[in-house]
């Protein structure tokens, strides 16, 4: 298998406009053959998606998903460039898939890691720096370990970083990118809200026997 060098990655990136990680995957899948890698990216819809990512996506649709048992519900907004595409089967399928993804990810709070407020990162850093397993380690090593843990934690909070529930070999970001390439427009997940039945309600846990006794005493 041919080595995937930085030079090959840059060459492919310049040709297609695809992201660095996508270029690496394409070259690895095609044994370092740049022409085949371009075809691989086009088949995945990635090359064309990157070129469209700068265009304004002001149309789209708001989708909903209610999980079996009606205990979890999701509202999500995904944008595209035209109303025609928003009404199409491919876009609507993406809307359903990402809605289901949100329902399956109770810890996800943001669309991307870029949206996570700095204070969240600082809070996570304070928690990690105080962990017992870091005690006695050199400061530079400690910082590096903490940095890795924070990055992992922030990814857990971001929808686009999650493995796609129907195909864990790709992330939600890659799913959206592939859909954009196939649709031929810029596609962007803008926002979402996840509802869990009873969330935030404090349920009083009474002892049934004590409750009966108190009712008798009251009588």
From Swiss-Prot:
Q: Name one GO molecular function term.
A: translation elongation factor activity
- SUPFAM superfamilies, A to Z: Elongation factor Ts (EF-Ts), dimerisation domain, UBA-like
> GO CC annotation: what is one?
cytoplasm
Main location group: cytoplasm
The keyword Disulfide bond appears for this protein? no
Where is it localised? Cytoplasm
Any Pfam family = EF_TS
Task: Kindly state which keywords UniProt assigns to this record, in alphabetical order.
Answer: Cytoplasm, Elongation factor, Protein biosynthesis
Question: Record's InterPro entries?
Answer: EF-Ts_dimer_sf, Transl_elong_EFTs/EF1B, Transl_elong_EFTs/EF1B_dimer, Transl_elong_Ts_CS, UBA-like_sf
Protein's name in the database: Elongation factor Ts
UniProt organism field:
Synechococcus sp. (strain CC9902)
Q: What would be the name of the gene that encodes this protein?
A: tsf
């Amino acid at each position: 298998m041919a080595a995937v060098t930085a030079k090959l990655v840059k060459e492919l990136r310049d040709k297609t406009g695809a992201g660095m990680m996508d270029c690496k995957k394409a070259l690895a899948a095609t044994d370092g053959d740049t022409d085949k890698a371009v075809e691989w990216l086009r088949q995945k819809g990635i090359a064309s998606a990157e070129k469209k990512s700068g265009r304004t996506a002001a149309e789209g649709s708001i989708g909903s998903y209610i999980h079996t048992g009606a205990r979890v519900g999701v509202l999500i907004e995904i944008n595209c460039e035209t109303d025609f595409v928003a009404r199409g089967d491919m876009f609507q399928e993406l809307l359903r898939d990402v809605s289901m993804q949100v329902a399956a990810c109770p810890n996800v709070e943001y669309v991307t890691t870029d949206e996570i407020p700095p204070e969240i990162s600082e809070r996570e850093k304070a928690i990690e720096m105080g962990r017992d397993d870091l005690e006695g380690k050199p400061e530079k090593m400690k910082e590096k370990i903490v940095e890795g843990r924070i990055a992992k934690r922030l990814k857990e909070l971001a929808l686009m970083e999650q493995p796609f529930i129907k195909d864990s070999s790709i992330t939600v970001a890659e799913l959206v990118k592939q859909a954009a390439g196939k649709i031929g427009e810029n596609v962007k997940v803008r926002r979402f809200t996840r509802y869990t039945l009873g969330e935030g309600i404090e349920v009083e846990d009474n002892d049934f026997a004590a409750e009966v006794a108190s009712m008798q005493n009251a009588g």
